Every structure is written in structure tokens, then in C-alpha cells.
Amino acid sequence: MKEENGFAGFLNTAVNRLSGVLNDTAPTKSQSLKNGVNNEGNRGFSLFRNPRFMSDEKLSSEASSHSTLGQQQARDGRQSPSKEAPFGEGELKLENFENQENEADEAENEETSYSEQNHTENTEEIAEESRPLERTHSGSNHHEASSTGHLNLPPLENTLSQGSAITAPSRKVSITSSNGVSARLSGYAFANSKRNRDFHRIFKVLPPEDHLIDDYGCALQRDIFLHGRMYLSESHICFNSSIFGWVTNIVIPVTEIVSVEKKSTAVVFPNAIQITTLHARYIFASFISRDTTYQLIIAIWKNTHPFLTTLANGHGVMDASGNHHSGSSNQSINADSSAGSEGVDEGTSTEANDESSEDDDEDNNTDEANEDAQSNVSDESPKGEGSSHSDNVVLSDGNSVKKMNEDGADTSLLSVSEVTSHPPTEWTGSPLAHVLCSDVVNLSVSTVFNLLCGSDTTWIINFFKSEKLTEIKIGKWEKIDDKWNRKVQYIKPVAPPYRQTSCYITDTIQHLDINNYIEILSTTSTPDVPSGTSFVVKTLYALSWAHSSKTKLNISYSVEWSKSSWLKGPIEKGAQEGQASYVKDLLTAFENYKVSPKGRRKKITKHTKKKNKHASETSVAPEKVDNSSIEQSSSFLTKLYTFPFTIITWLMHPTHLLLVVMFSMLVLQWWYMQQILHAELPSTSSRSDSSRDLDFDHIPMDDTAFKLWITSRLDSVERDRDFVYENSDPNLEHGKIKIATDYMERRLKKLKERLRKLEASGYI
């Protein structure tokens, strides 16, 4: 019984404390406490607030209000609900506390979800104030309270205590380096901030967000090995070397790398890595841990191109299309050659202009009937369609141009008549994706067309030669599907390491109207290069008439892809550069081209040709002699003037400078050894010839040596004398002293005679 009374007292204390922190009830507290029940039949209690967020003034005001209410209840003759409801009686039962605890858990979950929805931007911060939730008792409990006349207690609610927290949603976890930068390369950490600052201090061209991962000691293989360090970052592979003030910096973007291979130095030592880009090849040797460096380079490379697959032997890569690209092959990836070389898209040279002028002179020697025999457009079907491919091309090898068909004539080639005057016209077509030029050329439309696509391919072939193209093959014009087509093929040299590449061009005349406009589409493909089968370059040429019978030339191009490739960016960049260079050369060629003046030409016989030829030879011969002599003298002066600059340029090469320094050191060493071996004594060099003649009685030592000997002997005699006196032995070393004294007397006598002779001869 005592235990039950103690537990009842504990419950009464808990109820009093709970009633002290209750929030405002729904009608006024005084009215509800006086009546004992709610007028509306339901008693509502609000979720009380956390005392941590309540001000002291509010707590004190609530305490005073509750004390006032208690006094008012006492005056009304009512007892406290806690006194009227001892343990086991009334409406306060243990089941109520259990039900209220479950309901409190549900309320806490609802409150937590609500707080998460309102704090999505910063989920780690706890809401400063919880949203109150209102709960009501059921109608049955209210009916029981009204019937018994007792006041039902509010349900026990769980609230956010001072140590509670709201669960934040899951966040993405990333591994960060020591300097706080999130690493995008999985499994590798960035270098510390000091090394990163030193890295950007050396390579100032790199963006600051390109962080250093690691660096390794190695040597760049060139004419000599340049020892330095390789720096690996997220987007670049860099190398720095400083030898005797010669600084070498290399920055290789990872996006331009074609292959990464393991190599051996001197075919024996497996400590080198070869990195090949679109335009260059770099060999780094002398790695202490070659495999570790190689794996990191491959990881960075794959991080930039996630769909790359390294082959099993570690040589070359394979792209998503399955094409294997080997870094050791001689294929060219130079987009300059794959995009900028078209069948009608090369520049000219002075040699081409000279040969064109010679062709015009030969045309002037034809008959008048041949002058008027020009057709507008040759619509004849090509001959020899069943012949081999070699019979339908014009081959240029070296300086010779050969037509491969047997009869020596190419009647299927296209040509248009020369129109010298025409009003302006407008090109109604649309350009391709990238416009290269829209300029006016000081030539007629017919002239420009004949130079590019005419039957006489001398100009275009010479132009190809000026661009250093080889194995030029220009096919015949063939009419296919009412459109003229021509095949062009040549080999273009490119930058190392690939040396050259083959280009295949198809020229198609889409619209041919000399009185309106001409439209030519040239399609270039380079299947031999990596990803060469995945794209073609199309170039559109539009010729229309401008003012003063000139030509309005519109050139545009586009790169069309049939497959996806990881070299798309570099290839399109190279295509843009190659096309821009080509257009510049082409416009220069048209400006340098000169049309021979047309006029009434006389019929020239064979006798007239021979006579004119002989006169021209006799008149030009002296000029050639004079010009040759002038050229020789001018060339000699030019060489003499440029010789110092040539030497300086030659010495600027590190290898040459090192050889010169080593040779100079060898010469200096040889001279120094000669000076040591054949050195002359000071007194000997000062002697005159006359004194040598007078020295008939030669003394076996010079003056300086004699003085040194005298001094040493006197010291020795002095020491011996002291020793003799101290030891009282007069016979000790007596013989040696006597010999020295005799020699000194003879020496003194000879010196006196020599002095006398010099005085007699007048030297003293």
C-alpha cells in the first residue's frame, strides 16, 4: 500500500509538471477549466513547444496564469484533477500512457518528414522551431469525462528536446584531396597545394582548375636526352627541362593523344613511353617506375575518353566503332590533309603561271579556224568506259604529265566557251555549314571554271605540285545521273610522325550554266587514317558573275560523320585550318594568273616560226650571260652577308653548341700542357744573345738557382757548426764543409771574371 501511494505521488507530480507547460487550449483556458468540459464537445490541446525555444518572459507568464487558475479552482470548491484521480481510479490509467506513446511516435515521424520537405537545400541544419501539431481526444473519452465529471488529461506528446536532431536525406559522397578539391579521377589523389602552385608557376598557360596529380623524373628523347620531369594533370601531360639555361616546356592535351605505347631505350632497356598525338610523337625515357607512370597516363586518358579500350598488349587503342588505331603506324591523322585537299582546291605558283603563258603562246600559233572552233559544253558520253581505271586518268609523276589513254586524246573532258563580258548574276543556292570566302576574283567565270575543271589540266597539276603533292591522278569527266563527275587522287605529305597520306576526291558539277552560275561539290575522303572511314569533307564552290565581268566566288565546307569517333574535335579543328589555308592559296593563285590578250592573230608558217625562234635566241643570249654573272655576284654577297647569322643559328642548336664547347676545352687543355712541358725559367728569357756568347765558361745552374743553393748550403753549414760546437767534435762533417767552401770559392772567382768582362764590354 505504501508503494502504491508513492507511485501515485510520482504520477501526480508528473501531471502537475505537464499541465505547467501546456499551450493555449482551444476556447479560453479559464472557461474550459470552470466548466470542466469543452462547449463544443471536444477538448483540443496543441502540441506544446520546446522550452528551449520559449522566452523567459513567456514561461513566467504561463506559470503565473496557471497559479491564478489554481487559486480560482480552489475558490470554486473544485479539487485538482490529480487529487480526484488516484492510481487505479478515475480516467488516468496506464493504458492511456501506452497509447499516447505510440501516438507520440507517429507525430514525431510526421514532424520529421515535414521538416525534411521544408529544408531540402540545407538538410544538415535543424529547424529552429517545430510546427505544432494539434490532436483531439476521441468522442468516447470525452463522453466518459463528461459523465464522471472528471477532467481528462491531454495525451503525452513527444517533442524535440535540446539534443534531438532531424535525420537528413542521403548525400553524394565524394573523395576529396587535402586541398579540398573534389577529384574526378577515381583512385588517384591530387598533389598538395605547394606542388600544384609550382606546377602552375612553370606552365602558366594551363588553367588554374587543372590540378596536378603527380610528377615523375624522365628524359625527353631528341638529338640528345633532355633530362627533366613529367607532370600529369587532369587534362594535360607536361614536360619541363632546364639544362645550362636552355629551358624546354612541352604541353600535350590529353584530348589530342592518339596512342600511348611502352618502348625500350636502345632496344634493351624497357624504361620508355611513347606518346603520339595528331601532329607529333614524343618519347620519354629513363623512368624509374615506367609501368606506374604508364598506368596513370592510361587512367587519365580513359577518364577523358571513357569509351576507349586499350588492347591486350598495351599498344594502340580501339574506339567505339571497333577501328584499331596503332600509334606505331605511318598513317596520317592530320586533318589538314584529310580536309583541306580537294580535287579543285589547291593554290598556284609562278611556275604554273609561266607554263600557262606558254600554253597561251602556243594557242596563238594555231590556225584561225581552230580559234573559232570552241563548243559550249561537251555533252558526249565518255569513251572507253569498259577500259581499266588506269586508262581513264591523267598521271603526274615528277615533272612529266602523261595521258594514259592510247590515242593521246581525252575527248570526254569538260570545257566551256570563253565569255569575256556578262552582266552580274546571283547564286540561288545555299552554302554549307562553314563559309570560307565570298570574294570577287578578277577573272571571268569561264576562265575560273576552265582552270579548275577544264580539259587542260596543266594549271591544276602545276598547282598541286606547288603544294608538294605527289602521285597525282586526275580522271576523266563522266556523266552519271545527268551530272558530271571526276575522280582525283594524290598523296600529300604531312607533319611527322605520319609523313604522308592518300586523299581521294570526287568532284561533282551540280549546276552548270555559264550565263547564270556554276556549282561544284567536292567530296574528300581519307580512309587510311584513324577514323578515316567515319567522316568525309564536302566543299562547295559557287561561281557567279559580278560587276565588270568578274567572278563572285563563294566557298563553304562541312564535315559529315557517318560514325562516332573520339577524334571528332581534333579532326574538325584541323579541317577548319586546312580549308582556310587552301582558300588563301587559291585566291592568291587567281590573282597571279594572267590571261593572254586576245586579238586578230595571223597565220604563222613554219619558216616564220624558225626565223622568230632564231632571232629570239640571238637577242636573249647576251642577257642570259649578264644575268648569270650578276646572279653569281649577288649570291656570293648574299652568302657572305648571311654567313654570321647562319653560324649563330647553327650555334643556337644545343648539340652544336655542346660540340663547340667540348672542342674549345680540348684545345685549351692542349695549350696548357704545352706551356707546362716547355716552360722557360724567368732569368733565361731575360738573357741577351751577347751574354750567351760571353758565357764561355758555363756554370751548371742559373743565378736564381745558385742563390737558392747558396742559402740552403749556408743554413746547412750553420746547423752543422752549431752541432759541432755543442757536441765538441771538430772532425764531424769536416770534409763536407771543406768541399762546399772550395766550390763556393771557385764559383765566386768565375762570377768576378764574368762581371769584369761585362764592365769591359759596356753592358754595365
Swiss-Prot record:
Residues 197-264 form the GRAM domain. Residues 22-173, 320-406, 598-626 are annotated as: Disordered. Glycans are attached at residues 23, 118, 240, 330, 364, 376, 442, 554, 627. Pfam families: GRAM, VASt. Residues 668-764 are cytoplasmic. GO terms for molecular function: lipid binding; sterol binding; sterol transfer activity. It is found in: Membrane. Residues 25-41, 61-82, 158-173, 331-340, 389-399 have a biased composition (Polar residues). SMART domains: GRAM. Residues 118-145 have a biased composition (Basic and acidic residues). PANTHER family: GRAM DOMAIN CONTAINING 1B, ISOFORM E. PROSITE patterns: VAST. It is a single-pass membrane protein. One of its GO terms (cellular component) is nucleus-vacuole junction. The modification Phosphoserine is found at residue 80. One of its GO terms (biological process) is intracellular sterol transport. Gene3D superfamilies: Pleckstrin-homology domain (PH domain)/Phosphotyrosine-binding domain (PTB). This is Uncharacterized membrane protein C20F10.07. The chain crosses the membrane at residues 647-667. Residues 598-613 have a biased composition (Basic residues). Residues 321-330 have a biased composition (Low complexity). Residues 1-646 are lumenal. The keyword Disulfide bond does not apply. Belongs to the YSP2 family.
